[in-house]
Curated annotation (Swiss-Prot):
Keywords: Isomerase, tRNA processing
Keyword Iron attached: no
This enzyme's EC code(s): 5.4.99.12
InterPro entries given in the database record: PsdUridine_synth_cat_dom_sf, PsdUridine_synth_TruA, PsdUridine_synth_TruA_a/b_dom, PsdUridine_synth_TruA_C, TruA/RsuA/RluB/E/F_N
Function: Formation of pseudouridine at positions 38, 39 and 40 in the anticodon stem and loop of transfer RNAs.
Pfam families, per the entry: PseudoU_synth_1
Biological process according to GO: tRNA pseudouridine synthesis
Protein name per the record: tRNA pseudouridine synthase A
Residues annotated as catalytic: 52 (nucleophile)
Catalytic activity: uridine(38/39/40) in tRNA = pseudouridine(38/39/40) in tRNA
Self-association state and partner proteins as the record states: Homodimer.
Enzyme class: isomerase
Source organism (scientific name): Paraburkholderia xenovorans (strain LB400)
Cross-referenced HAMAP family: TruA (MF_00171)
Length: 270
């Protein structure tokens, strides 16, 4: 039995999230159907992070076990030939038995793309969040500083969250404006259900001046979801990258087809 890892990208706007559902309109259902067609045998996948309805995948990682012997490029091209245009396998790589797409991961990175303009753009529908009024980027960055570190993030946790603990370690939140867009980057060991969208809701409240910077610390300390802002829209949220130990040599996400994804790589080079 061989263990194969795949890098997967998808447009989350047309799916009811990642996880398999009875109606079948999920990314997992489509991917496993394509793998079954290509491999001519049922394939069960394990995913790094189960994204919600409307959330996109740039750097999603899955693994599965199979007895078939196929070249890496065959897994990519063969599976893609059975996938809809809204899902694409970017790479395939054999892995040792100890690799696990979910449990071997030590960090996840999400991007949120927010369009700031008086009028919404149909060209960005389901690709970016939208607010009509200017936001204070410096205030949002200052508020984000209150969240860095290991904390109980219950105030940013949905009622449907199945995580065993609300305690997560948030390593980084960056906020950067580029023209009419504000780009957010969130990096943590793991995230709770709706955590990034709930963080976004609070950051936007502060950016609008509806709450002071210090309010973010109060929300965190409250551990009360009702004390925080409403959950923000999923449209601009992307699972950007999953971090693994170097021993597994997991390929970096192929993000060149998404122009705004260079915001953070350009920042790293300056």
């Amino acid at each position: 039995m061989k263990r194969i890892a795949l890098g997967v990208q998808y447009d989350g706007s047309v799916f009811c999230g990642w996880q398999s559902q009875p109606h079948g309109n999920t990314v997992q259902d489509e991917l496993e159907r394509a793998l079954r067609e290509f491999a001519q045998t049922p394939v069960q996948t394990i995913v790094a992070g189960r994204t919600d309805t409307g959330v996109h995948g740039l750097g999603q990682v899955v693994h599965f076990d199979t007895e078939l012997d196929r070249a890496d490029v065959s897994w990519v091209r063969g599976t893609n030939s059975f996938l809809p245009k809204t899902i694409s396998v970017q790479w395939a790589k054999p892995m040792p038995d100890e690799f696990h797409a979910r449990f071997s991961a030590f960090e996840r990175t999400y991007y949120y793309v927010l369009y700031v303009h008086p009028v919404r753009s149909p060209m960005l529908a389901a690709r970016a969040g939208w607010v009509h009024a200017a936001l204070d980027v410096d205030a949002m960055q200052a508020a984000a500083a209150h969240l860095i570190g290991e904390h109980d993030f219950s105030a940013f946790r949905s009622s449907q969250c199945q995580s065993k603990t609300p305690v997560k370690h948030l390593y980084q939140i960056d906020v950067r404006q580029q023209g009419d867009f504000i780009h957010f980057r969130f990096r943590a060991n793991a995230f709770l259900h709706h955590m990034v969208r709930n963080l976004m809701g609070c950051l936007v409240y502060i950016g609008r001046g509806r709450r002071p910077v210090e309010w973010m610390a109060e929300v965190l300390a409250s551990r009360d979801r009702e004390f925080a802002a409403p959950t923000f829209m999923p449209d601009g949220l992307y699972l950007a990258q999953v971090g693994y130990p170097e021993q597994f040599a997991v390929p970096a996400p192929q993000t060149g087809s998404v122009p705004w994804s260079t915001v953070w790589t350009e920042q790293a080079q300056t």
